[in-house]
C-alpha cells in the first residue's frame, strides 16, 4: 500500500471522473478534466528538466489553476512550496533561496515582484504565469502563460514510481520569525492533516481505496475553504475533498458578503475559516443582511469549522444564535503537528482564553520534566504530538533539534504551544511561548487576553504584546482596532476584561489602530504589533504604569 498523495487523488479521479471537482467564479472542472490538466502540467515540468524532489513554488490566490498545479507537482514527483502572496521582494528572495526553488507558478499581478527577485535567484528556470485580468509584463523574464504551456504537453498518466516516503513541504507563516519548511512524509501528512484517519474513531483508514469507494457510493460534499492555499488548513480541506470525491469552491479574495452568497449559490455543505479574523466579518455581514431584509438560503450548510487561530467564545455564541442546528467546530494544530484536537461548540460555554478542545490519542501536554500533565493539576505544559509527525525543518538542523525531541524513547513534535489540562481531560490552549509576556515573574499568554478584549462590544480586533515596564520588566499592552464610530478607553476595557481574566493579565497601556495586521490566513503578526508600540506613544497608559513611550 503506497499512501502517496498523487495516488490517493487518482483513486478518486478513477471512481468519479464526471463529478465536479473544482468551482471558481464561473469556471468549473470535473475530476476527469482536472486529471488531464494536472497530467499536462506534470509533463511540462518534467520536459523542462524538473526532477524528483525539485521544488516548485505556487504564488497564487485561491483559484482552479493552483489546484491543477498542486496535483501536477505531486504527480511529477516534485515538491510544492506555498508562497505567501503578500510577500515583498526581500521575503520572496529568502523563500525562493531557502527552498531551492527551480520552477514557479504565479499570478500575472505579481510579475513586477518576480522580475525584481529573479536576477538574485538564478536557479528558477521555469516560470508559468496565470492570467488574472492584470496587464503586468512577464515576457521580460521568460514567463509562459499557464494554459498555453499545458497545451504542448502530454495528457497521459505515465509517471515514475511513487512512495509514501515522498516529501511534502509545508512552509510556516513566518509571523514570529522567518518561514520554515516543515518536511512531511506523504503518509504522515495524509494521516494527520489530509483525511487518512477516521474522524469518528481516531483510527487510521487502512484501505488505500477506502475514500474513493465512499466517493463512488455517495453524493459529493461541497467544501468551501476561505483561507488562502498558503495555509495548511486550506490545503487540508482541498486534499480531503479530492481524495473523497468532493467539490471544492475557491474564491481569490475574502469578501464576507460574497462568502454567504457563494454558500447560497453553490449549496455549500462545509465552510472552513481561521478564527476571529474571518469569523467576525462573516458575522457582521450576516447580521447586516438580516437587518436589510436580505435572505440567504443556507440550508445546505451544516458545518462551520475554525482552525489554527483564536475563535472567541462571544463569536461562537452569536453564530449559534444566527445558525442554529449547525455543527460549529474549533480545532488546534500547526504546520509541525497537523490537527491535534477539536471541540464541538455548544451553547452556554463559559470558559475564557484560547480554544478548549478534546485532544487525539497522539497529542499530549508535557511539563518541564517531560512528563504528561495530569488533568486538573493546574500545571501548564507544552502541546506535544507523537506518531505521524514531520521529519524536521528543511535545511535547519538546529531548529529541528529544538522542536522535534525524543523524550523517554518517544519522538515528539513540540512547536511551543502552551496549554492546561482540565479536570475532564480537555485541553485549554494558552498560546505560543515565544510571544508570551513576562510581567513581574508571571507568564501571560496573549490569546487569553485577546479573547477577553474582543468580547467588548467596541473592539473589532486586538493583539496583545509585552512592553518595557520599570517595575515589572514588562506589562501587557493592547493594540486595538475599534469598531467603526467607537473609541474604547483603557478604563472601559479594564472593567470588561477583569470579569474574565486575572488582574495581572489586564492591559496597562493601549494603542488604537485603523487595522490589525494579520497574515492572509488570519494569523496574528506580533512583530508588527510590537513595532506599533515602539514607533509611537500609547494612546493611554494606566496611572500606575509609566511606559517609556507614553504620551
Curated annotation (Swiss-Prot):
It comes from Mycolicibacterium smegmatis (strain ATCC 700084 / mc(2)155). PROSITE patterns: AMP_BINDING (PS00455). Belongs to the ATP-dependent AMP-binding enzyme family. NCBIfam families: PRK07798.1. It catalyses: a medium-chain fatty acid + ATP + CoA = a medium-chain fatty acyl-CoA + AMP + diphosphate; a long-chain fatty acid + ATP + CoA = a long-chain fatty acyl-CoA + AMP + diphosphate; (25S)-3-oxocholest-4-en-26-oate + ATP + CoA = (25S)-3-oxocholest-4-en-26-oyl-CoA + AMP + diphosphate. The keyword Ligase applies. PANTHER family: LONG-CHAIN-FATTY-ACID--COA LIGASE, NONRIBOSOMAL PEPTIDE SYNTHASE PES1 (EUROFUNG)-RELATED. Not essential for degradation of straight chain sterols such as cholesterol. Catalyzes the activation of medium/long-chain fatty acids as acyl-coenzyme A (acyl-CoA), which are then transferred to the multifunctional polyketide synthase (PKS) type III for further chain extension. Disruption phenotype: Not required for growth on rich medium, nor with cholesterol as a sole energy source. Cannot use beta-sitosterol as a sole carbon and energy source, it can use 1,4-BNC (3-oxo-23,24-bisnorchola-1,4-dien-22-oic acid) an early intermediate of beta-sitosterol degradation. SUPFAM superfamilies: Acetyl-CoA synthetase-like. It comes from the Bacteria. Keywords: ATP-binding, Cholesterol metabolism, Fatty acid metabolism, Ligase, Lipid metabolism, Nucleotide-binding, Steroid metabolism, Sterol metabolism. Pathway: Lipid metabolism; fatty acid biosynthesis; Steroid metabolism; cholesterol metabolism. It holds the Pfam family AMP-binding. This is Medium/long-chain-fatty-acid--CoA/3-oxocholest-4-en-26-oate--CoA ligase.
Amino acid at each position: 500500500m503506497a499512501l502517496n498523495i498523487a495516488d490517493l487523488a487518482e483513486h478518486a479521479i478513477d471512481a468519479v471522473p464526471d463529478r465536479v471537482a473544482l468551482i471558481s467564479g464561473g469556471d468549473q472542472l470535473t475530476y476527469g478534466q482536472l486529471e488531464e490538466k494536472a497530467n499536462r502540467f506534470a509533463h511540462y515540468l518534467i520536459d523542462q528538466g524538473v526532477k524528483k524532489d525539485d521544488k516548485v513554488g505556487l504564488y497564487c490566490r485561491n483559484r482552479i489553476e493552483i489546484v491543477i498545479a498542486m496535483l501536477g507537482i505531486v504527480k511529477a514527483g516534485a515538491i510544492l512550496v506555498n508562497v505567501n502572496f503578500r510577500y515583498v521582494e526581500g521575503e520572496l528572495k529568502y523563500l525562493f533561496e531557502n527552498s531551492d526553488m527551480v520552477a514557479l507558478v504565479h499570478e500575472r499581478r505579481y510579475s513586477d515582484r518576480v522580475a525584481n527577485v529573479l536576477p538574485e535567484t538564478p536557479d528558477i528556470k521555469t516560470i508559468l504565469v496565470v492570467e488574472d485580468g492584470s496587464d503586468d509584463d512577464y515576457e521580460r523574464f521568460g514567463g509562459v502563460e499557464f494554459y498555453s504551456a499545458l497545451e504542448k504537453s502530454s495528457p497521459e498518466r505515465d509517471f515514475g514510481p511513487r512512495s509514501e516516503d515522498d516529501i511534502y513541504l509545508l512552509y510556516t507563516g513566518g509571523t514570529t520569525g522567518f518561514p520554515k519548511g516543515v518536511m512531511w512524509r506523504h503518509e504522515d501528512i495524509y494521516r494527520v492533516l489530509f483525511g487518512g484517519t477516521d474522524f469518528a474513531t481516531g483510527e487510521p483508514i487502512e484501505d488505500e481505496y477506502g475514500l474513493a469507494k465512499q466517493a463512488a457510493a455517495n453524493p459529493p460534499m461541497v467544501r468551501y475553504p476561505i483561507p488562502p492555499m498558503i495555509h495548511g488548513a486550506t490545503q487540508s480541506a482541498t486534499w480531503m475533498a479530492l481524495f473523497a470525491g468532493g467539490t471544492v469552491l475557491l474564491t481569490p479574495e475574502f469578501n464576507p458578503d460574497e462568502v454567504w452568497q457563494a454558500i447560497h449559490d453553490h449549496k455549500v455543505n462545509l465552510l472552513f475559516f481561521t478564527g476571529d479574523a474571518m469569523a467576525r466579518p462573516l458575522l457582521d455581514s450576516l447580521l447586516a443582511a438580516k437587518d436589510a431584509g436580505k435572505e440567504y438560503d443556507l440550508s445546505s450548510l451544516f458545518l462551520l469549522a475554525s482552525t489554527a487561530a483564536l475563535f472567541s467564545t462571544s463569536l461562537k455564541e452569536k453564530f449559534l444564535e444566527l445558525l442554529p442546528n449547525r455543527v460549529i467546530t474549533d480545532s488546534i494544530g500547526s504546520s509541525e503537528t497537523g490537527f491535534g484536537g477539536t471541540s464541538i461548540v455548544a451553547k452556554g460555554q463559559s470558559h475564557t482564553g484560547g480554544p478548549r478542545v478534546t485532544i487525539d490519542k497522539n497529542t499530549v501536554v508535557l511539563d518541564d520534566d517531560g512528563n504528561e500533565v495530569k488533568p486538573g493539576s493546574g500545571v501548564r505544559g507544552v502541546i506535544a504530538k507523537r506518531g505521524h509527525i514531520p521529519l524536521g525543518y528543511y535545511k535547519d538542523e538546529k531548529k529541528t533539534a529544538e522542536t522535534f525531541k525524543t523524550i523517554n524513547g518517544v519522538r515528539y513534535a513540540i512547536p511551543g504551544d502552551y496549554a492546561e489540562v482540565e479536570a475532564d481531560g480537555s485541553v485549554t490552549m494558552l498560546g505560543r511561548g515565544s510571544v508570551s509576556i513576562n510581567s513581574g515573574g508571571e507568564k501571560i499568554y496573549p490569546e487569553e487576553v485577546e479573547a477577553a478584549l474582543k468580547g467588548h462590544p467596541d473592539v473589532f480586533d486586538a493583539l496583545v504584546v509585552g512592553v518595557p515596564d520599570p517595575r515589572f520588566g514588562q506589562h501587557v499592552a493592547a493594540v486595538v482596532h475599534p469598531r467603526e464610530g467607537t473609541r474604547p478607553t483603557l478604563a472601559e476595557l479594564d472593567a470588561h476584561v477583569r470579569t474574565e481574566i486575572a488582574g495581572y493579565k489586564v492591559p496597562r497601556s493601549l494603542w488604537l489602530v485603523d487595522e490589525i495586521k494579520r497574515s492572509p490566513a488570519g494569523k496574528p503578526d506580533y512583530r508588527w504589533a510590537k513595532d506599533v508600540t515602539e514607533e509611537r506613544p500609547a494612546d493611554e497608559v494606566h496611572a500606575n504604569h509609566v511606559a517609556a513611550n507614553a504620551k
